[in-house]
């Protein structure tokens, strides 16, 4: 007899896991504590809400996260399928209308006949086949139970979200539409800065007031989502190699490359909202308004959402998990999402996809499977379970996680294409073996 699967958390990983389990013909109880209990970062009651950027990053197969998306599409991913449905222009990236995206996923999950939604907080680890996908903002009571079960200290870092601006308040005479190196459609509004403007902006940023952290929390930032003010403090030129990099963004009015450029990315389908790319911040709201209005074109900008910052927790997965996302201590317990140390929206959903496939197999009396390292799904699972536990940090999908190709290819683009083609070929064999 097929057993049911209990999934805790309906974020990106939990939603994907529920979809995979139910589509394998296994009943699911999906627990989500919102709206009964809220988190500091979520704004809505929808599943798979995006709390940071609205971009799911690169879509090309010369980009590891692009390969990961394609692998997920081929496994009927609800997250990538819904992202494709609700995409907004973003050059070579896959960005979405954040509200439509989470609404689409919520509707699909709620209408699935094998998924039962339960809006309540879980404070202990249940019996039976369970996937815990409660994310970086796991409630205190469940966090404590997970730590007690795992017998090891959790880690944490801070994740910060960028401000969102009303497009109608941007001075369009001072900005220009362009994607870096003219890749894809011209999808970004670019705010050029002279050296003098940049220096004044940097000075204001490093001296702006931030929201103080609670005394018992130690600052620990993941490099991929570092607050802009922390980046600015690392040196006057640091931002010029990060979110303010001018390379490939020549100003069409002058034909020259500005000293610095700040990019604004479309945040909704109506193109009425734009976020400041890479400007995650923990500045006080009044300071955000003052400092970010120094950006050319944003002198009178209205902020529909200020940048916010919240704590993210993740486990010491190399010590605790198998590459199937099963607990080493209990075979019928799976973990998925950012709490496992995968970093990024797509990676979180991907871990939920694998945990879901394997939980469904277990429910049907079949053996869970490890995806080969030649696939992006497999390379991520391998990394988080084989890295050195002592120095374990969250990781994005990247080509450095894959095994080397049998032949050496000097050209980087050709090498990445070869890795991508191998990944999809190997995945096709895995899918065939699952049927």
Curated annotation (Swiss-Prot):
A cellular component annotation (GO) from this entry: cytosol
Subcellular locations according to the entry: Cytoplasm
Family: Belongs to the MnmG family. TrmFO subfamily.
Residue positions binding FAD: 9-14
Keywords per UniProt: Cytoplasm, FAD, Flavoprotein, Methyltransferase, NAD, NADP, Transferase, tRNA processing
Gene name of the record: trmFO
Organism of derivation: Enterococcus faecalis (strain ATCC 700802 / V583)
Catalytic activity: uridine(54) in tRNA + (6R)-5,10-methylene-5,6,7,8-tetrahydrofolate + NADH + H(+) = 5-methyluridine(54) in tRNA + (6S)-5,6,7,8-tetrahydrofolate + NAD(+); uridine(54) in tRNA + (6R)-5,10-methylene-5,6,7,8-tetrahydrofolate + NADPH + H(+) = 5-methyluridine(54) in tRNA + (6S)-5,6,7,8-tetrahydrofolate + NADP(+)
The protein's Enzyme Commission number: 2.1.1.74
Keyword Flavoprotein: yes
Main location, first listed in the record: cytoplasm
Biological processes per GO annotation: tRNA methylation; tRNA wobble uridine modification
Family matches, as Pfam families: GIDA
A GO molecular-function annotation: tRNA (uracil(54)-C5)-methyltransferase activity, 5,10-methylenetetrahydrofolate-dependent
Function field: Catalyzes the folate-dependent formation of 5-methyl-uridine at position 54 (M-5-U54) in all tRNAs.
Name under which the protein is recorded: Methylenetetrahydrofolate--tRNA-(uracil-5-)-methyltransferase TrmFO
Cofactors: FAD
Organism phylogeny: Bacteria, Bacillati, Bacillota, Bacilli, Lactobacillales
Disulfide-bonded cysteines: none
